[in-house]
């Protein structure tokens, strides 16, 4: 089977400014990858490039065996790439339920079955959203907005889910709830996940593989459990410049 995502020799940035240099990685179907590193090393740019929001300079991006670097953003989304950006970007004037239903897709372009994610499944994963289903997006807490952003991406029925710092700025009790939901999602659902996160140890706990970036390049790629078991090495890698 083809990998859910494969990058080779990736060079990208914003206009003529190059941020990512010679990035290569592979995420198998149902795989999970933590992307770690200090602020400003290219983690968010990596996700934005996969989605098509940056200037592509060289290399290749393949999703489920198909090269996508020349495709517009909406085509990448239709092929099964879901994106939870920083800032959540929910619709503040729509209710929780409206935010979810507006994102629902009934089939994928890649030939896999129709609806797998429904309102009921999202509410089962995030019970707090069921309780707030009739509240507008601007009437719920930051943690609930993050749950909504993830739920909305899932309603697109993705094969690959990109999440950019979903735990940022959240209270510890909400972080714990989100982590439990992510662990369940990775255990039960047939999708691959790339998780960009500043909370390195938390990200390593819920993923199988880890990638560390510095100055737009990959400086480490290996099993998450190995980094989690070696805090000293993790610290050296994450602060590497």
Predicted segments, located by residue:
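Helix-to-loop junction immediately C-terminal to a conserved catalytic motif
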Residues: 51
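Helical segment within the ABC ATPase nucleotide-binding domain
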Residues: 176-190
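Catalytic Walker B motif of ABC-type/P-loop ATPase nucleotide-binding domains
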Residues: 161-165
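Conserved ABC transporter NBD signature motif
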Residues: 59-68, 79, 113-119
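C-terminal boundary and immediately downstream tail of ABC-type ATPase nucleotide-binding domains
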Residues: 124, 206, 212-217, 221, ...
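The feature captures the beta-strand-to-loop junction immediately N-terminal to the Walker
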Residues: 36-38
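ABC ATPase C-loop
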Residues: 153-154
């Amino acid at each position: 089977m083809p990998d859910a995502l494969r990058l080779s020799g990736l060079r990208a940035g914003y206009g003529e400014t190059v941020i990512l240099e010679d990035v290569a990685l592979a995420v198998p179907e149902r795989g999970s990858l933590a992307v770690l590193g200090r602020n400003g090393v290219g983690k968010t740019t990596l996700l934005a490039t996969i989605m098509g929001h940056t200037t592509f300079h060289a290399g290749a991006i393949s999703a489920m065996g198909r090269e996508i670097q020349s495709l517009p953003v909406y085509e990448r989304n239709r092929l099964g790439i879901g994106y939870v950006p920083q800032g959540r970007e929910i619709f503040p004037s729509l209710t929780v339920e409206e935010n979810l239903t507006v994102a629902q897709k009934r089939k994928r372009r890649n030939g896999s079955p129709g609806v797998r994610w429904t309102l009921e499944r999202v509410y089962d994963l995030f019970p707090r959203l069921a309780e707030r289903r009739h509240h507008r997006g601007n009437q719920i807490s930051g943690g609930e907005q993050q749950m909504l952003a993830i739920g909305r991406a899932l309603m697109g029925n993705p094969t690959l889910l990109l999440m950019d710092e979903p735990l940022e700025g959240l209270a510890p009790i909400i972080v714990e709830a989100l982590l439990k939901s992510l662990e369940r999602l990775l255990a039960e659902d047939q999708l691959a996940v790339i998780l960009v996160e500043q909370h390195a140890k938390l990200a390593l706990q819920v993923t199988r593989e880890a990638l560390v970036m510095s100055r737009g390049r990959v400086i480490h790629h290996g099993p998450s459990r190995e980094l989690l078991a070696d805090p000293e090495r993790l610290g050296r890698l994450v602060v590497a410049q």
